[in-house]
Every structure is written in structure tokens, then in C-alpha cells.
């Protein structure tokens, strides 16, 4: 992508409305634009990052055996009345009427709708286990939306729903998602710590939040330091191995970890003093096992091996991609801007032409641009006639991992400069060597 033809509305000044680093940087880098309180447009740079986050989420959901579908944002009030939850959400739920005067709502979550889909088609235990997920916009009318897309009213959510014949089977499905979440956050460049959680209006009696540590986090967290360097389950993990997944779950929940809402002073004090960690954290995922809370009232039953009908045991598993993007920024930035993990960076490499219009510089940049693009890399080519300082500031602000700086003097020697955005290290190398570095 040539920067001269790209839509990248950079802000030179810090927006006054931004309270935290991620909100400030997302606005300055031209990733998002606020349309109204808690509602944002995702501009091209932000959309590229969001798409890469969603791609990783999808890959790990699919690896764990979940199947993607897509449910609508608008739901009928009847389903929520059937489950008994219609009044639980209060003013958070946006309620509307269509032209036929039917009560509708903008879905804050999808337990009722997915249960309705399940009961319409699945009648036998032979079709279980089943895990269905989608990535869709949700709306919750927050009293005080803040922090940009970290706590917005409209947001994108990946929610998965598992269906099993027995509680034991449902716990295995829960453990699958537990492991999938650990892997997802690791691939996003985050260390997420699972913590026992309150189930809230979703319901159930078994729930974990996944929290990343960040100074701007809304939650106070207490945990054992061992979580910071614990090994993440490998890509080769067998998700059908019940004992192995239970082992992973047991390992990750054996040491103390809790938010302030669930904090136990005595349990925390039992940790050796040098191993205690108290910090702020951001919730990036939440999983629930709620048994038959929805299947019982909504008649989601299957015929068991005994020939009798049984309500299915369900779980719900949420990740907010539009919340994850600022969470990644909170965990990875410096005074100059964003430092994206390579897995979600909007571009893999930025080529900075220090003298656009110079024949040698243009030729070297074009060669790098086409060869890296043809090799499958996402390349941003700064071919503008902006000043050098502005080009460097833009590259640092948007956080592209590798910068290739092409100037007349170095090109005359067949060389360019390569900068690592994360470390700040620079080195002068041949054009061919720069190509190899960018290719990884």
C-alpha cells in the first residue's frame, strides 16, 4: 500500500477526550473515529489490526472444534422473556419496536438465540458435543462509556456456545475453550491470567475471567508471580484428550489469582511474600459453564442413550476483539507510539523513502515494495514528500514492526537502514539483506 494513496488521518496533537494511552494512540494514529458516545467507526488502519485479531481468534476456535455461524444483531423480546432474562439487563438493553409494533432488542449477548437455534435442529445425543460461535456486533447502553473502544456501547464480540449431554462432557468443552483462550492471547502478544469470576447476569456456577496486567486496568488483581512465565499449551495440543486438558486447567488454576471482587486475603497472604503480585488488570475474555440455566426453560433437550429426553448442559465463551486492540496497545507502547506484536501489526514492514523523486531512491523502494509484497508481506510504502522527521514520527506512531529507511547516501552504496520498532535498534545493511530481514 502506497501511503500517498492510503487513508491515514494522523492527528498531530493529543486528543483532549482521551483518558488512557490506548485511546489517545488509536485516535492519533487514525485507527478509529468516535461517532457518538461509546460508538466508533474503525478506519482503515484500525480495521487491518481488527481483522488480524479476528483471524487469530477464528483459528484457535476452529482448532478447538468450534464451528462458526452468524446470528443477527436484532433479536425478538419473546426469546428473552422465555428465558426469564428480559428484565435482568435493565436500561443496558436497547429495546425497540418494528413497524408491526413487535418488541425487539439490539442483542447484548446471544444465549437465548443460540439455544433457540439448537433446539430447532438437534434432537439426539449423537449430535453432541457441539460448539457454535460467531463474531458479531453487540450493544449495551453503558451509563458511562469511556476509554475509547475499551469500554464502548457498541462492540464486536466473539461468543461461542457449547452443548453437551452431561456435566462431565460440558466441563471438557469448558476446558477446550480455556486452553483455546490461553493460546489465543499468547498469539496476540498478551499474557492473560485466568481468574475465578462472578457469573453476573449470564448465570451459572463455574466461570473464569482472563486478565492482562496493565497500569490503566479497571480491575485490581492479586495473583502468584508464576503466571508470568508459565508455558502455554502447544499448537499440537489434542483437544479430544480429556485428561490432558483437565491437567492444563488444573495447572493454570492451582495458584491463587483473583480480581478484587473475588479476592480472599487469607489465600493471598498464604503466598510467599516474594511471589505475590498486586497490580491493575484488563479483562480480555470471560468463559462460563451454566448447566441447564437456559436449556431447561427453553426446552433445549436431546434424547439420551436411555431413550429419555435430557436438557443439555451449556457453556458460553466471550472475547471482545474491539476491546483486545486497545488492550494490546496498553501492554505494548512507548512515548513515540504503538509497538504492535508482529501477529497483529497493520503492516509487516514500512519502507520510508527519504527523498521521493530521486531516481535511485525510488528504484530501490520500488524493488523492495514489489518483492516483499509478492512474497506475501503486508507492506506500507511511504512515498510521500513529507519531511524526514514527519515520516519517522508516523512510522513510530502506527507501530509497524520493521522500518526500512532508504536515503540517497546509503543507496549510492547499495545499502539501506533497517530499524526494529520494538528495540529501536538500527543497522545499515545491503538491500538484499534488508529484504531477508523483512521476510523473517
From Swiss-Prot:
Family statement drawn from the similarity comment of this UniProt entry: Belongs to the class-II aminoacyl-tRNA synthetase family. ProS type 2 subfamily.
InterPro entries the record matches: aa-tRNA-synt_IIb (IPR002314), aa-tRNA-synth_II (IPR006195), aa-tRNA-synth_II/BPL/LPL (IPR045864), Anticodon-bd (IPR004154), Anticodon-bd_dom_sf (IPR036621), Pro-tRNA-ligase_IIa (IPR002316), Pro-tRNA-synth_IIa_bac-type (IPR004500), Pro-tRNA_synthetase (IPR050062)
Any one Pfam family match given in the protein's UniProt record, by short name: tRNA-synt_2b
Organism, as annotated: Agrobacterium fabrum (strain C58 / ATCC 33970) (Agrobacterium tumefaciens (strain C58))
Compartments, as annotated in UniProt: Cytoplasm
Catalytic function, reaction form: tRNA(Pro) + L-proline + ATP = L-prolyl-tRNA(Pro) + AMP + diphosphate
PROSITE patterns, sorted: AA_TRNA_LIGASE_II
Function: Catalyzes the attachment of proline to tRNA(Pro) in a two-step reaction: proline is first activated by ATP to form Pro-AMP and then transferred to the acceptor end of tRNA(Pro).
Top enzyme category: ligase
Highest taxon of the lineage: Bacteria
Disulfide bonds: none
Entry's Gene Ontology molecular function annotations: ATP binding; proline-tRNA ligase activity
Protein's name in the database: Proline--tRNA ligase
GO cellular component, one term: cytosol
HAMAP family (UniProt xref): Pro_tRNA_synth_type2 (MF_01570)
Keyword field contains Protein biosynthesis: yes
Record key words, sorted: Aminoacyl-tRNA synthetase, ATP-binding, Cytoplasm, Ligase, Nucleotide-binding, Protein biosynthesis
BP-aspect Gene Ontology terms: prolyl-tRNA aminoacylation
SUBUNIT field: Homodimer.
Chief place of localization: cytoplasm
EC number, as in UniProt: 6.1.1.15
Amino acid at each position: 500500500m502506497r501511503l500517498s494513496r492510503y487513508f491515514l488521518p494522523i492527528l498531530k496533537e493529543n486528543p483532549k477526550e482521551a483518558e488512557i494511552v490506548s485511546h489517545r494512540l488509536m485516535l492519533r494514529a487514525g485507527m478509529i473515529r468516535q461517532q457518538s458516545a461509546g460508538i466508533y467507526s474503525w478506519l482503515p488502519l484500525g480495521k487491518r489490526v481488527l481483522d488480524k485479531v479476528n483471524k487469530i481468534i477464528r483459528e484457535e476456535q476452529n482448532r478447538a472444534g468450534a464451528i462458526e455461524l452468524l446470528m443477527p444483531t436484532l433479536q425478538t423480546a419473546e426469546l428473552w422473556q422465555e428465558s426469564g432474562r428480559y428484565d435482568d439487563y435493565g436500561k443496558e438493553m436497547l429495546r425497540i419496536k418494528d413497524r408491526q409494533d413487535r418488541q425487539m432488542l439490539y442483542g447484548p449477548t446471544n444465549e437465548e438465540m443460540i439455544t433457540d437455534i439448537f433446539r430447532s435442529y438437534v434432537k439426539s445425543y449423537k449430535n453432541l458435543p457441539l460448539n457454535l460461535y460467531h463474531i458479531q456486533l453487540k450493544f449495551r447502553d453503558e451509563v458511562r462509556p469511556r476509554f475509547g473502544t475499551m469500554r464502548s456501547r457498541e462492540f464486536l464480540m466473539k461468543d461461542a456456545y457449547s452443548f453437551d449431554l452431561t456435566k462431565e462432557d460440558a466441563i471438557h468443552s469448558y476446558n477446550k475453550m480455556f486452553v483455546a483462550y490461553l493460546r489465543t492471547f499468547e498469539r496476540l502478544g498478551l499474557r492473560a491470567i485466568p481468574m475465578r469470576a462472578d457469573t453476573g447476569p449470564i448465570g451459572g456456577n463455574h466461570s473464569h475471567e482472563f486478565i492482562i496486567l496493565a497500569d490503566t486496568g479497571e480491575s485490581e488483581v492479586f495473583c502468584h508471580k508464576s503466571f508470568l512465565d508459565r508455558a502455554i499449551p502447544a499448537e499440537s495440543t489434542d483437544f479430544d484428550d480429556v485428561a490432558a486438558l483437565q491437567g492444563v486447567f488444573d495447572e493454570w488454576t492451582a495458584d491463587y489469582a483473583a480480581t478484587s471482587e473475588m479476592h480472599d486475603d487469607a489465600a493471598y497472604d498464604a503466598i510467599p511474600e516474594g511471589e505475590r503480585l498486586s497490580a491493575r488488570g484488563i479483562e480480555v475474555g470471560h468463559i462460563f459453564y451454566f448447566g441447564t440455566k437456559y436449556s431447561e426453560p427453553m426446552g433445549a433437550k436431546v434424547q439420551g442413550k436411555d431413550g429419555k429426553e435430557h436438557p443439555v448442559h451449556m457453556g458460553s465463551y466471550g472475547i471482545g476483539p474491539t476491546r483486545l486492540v486497545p488492550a494490546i496497545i496498553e501492554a505494548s507502547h512507548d512515548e513515540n507510539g504503538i509497538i504492535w506484536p508482529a501477529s497483529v501489526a497493520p503492516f509487516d514492514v514500512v519502507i520510508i523513502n527519504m527523498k521521493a523523486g530521486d531516481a535511485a531512491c525510488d528504484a530501490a523502494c520500488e524493488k523492495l515494495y514489489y518483492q516483499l509484497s509478492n512474497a506475501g508481506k503486508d507492506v506500507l510504502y511511504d512515498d510521500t514528500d513529507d519531511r524526514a522527521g514527519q515520516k519517522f514520527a508516523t512510522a513510530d506512531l502506527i507501530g509497524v514492526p520493521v522500518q526500512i529507511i532508504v536515503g540517497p547516501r546509503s543507496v549510492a552504496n547499495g545499502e539501506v537502514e533497517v530499524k526494529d520498532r520494538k528495540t529501536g535498534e538500527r543497522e545499515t545493511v545491503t538491500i538484499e539483506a534488508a529484504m531477508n530481514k523483512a521476510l523473517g
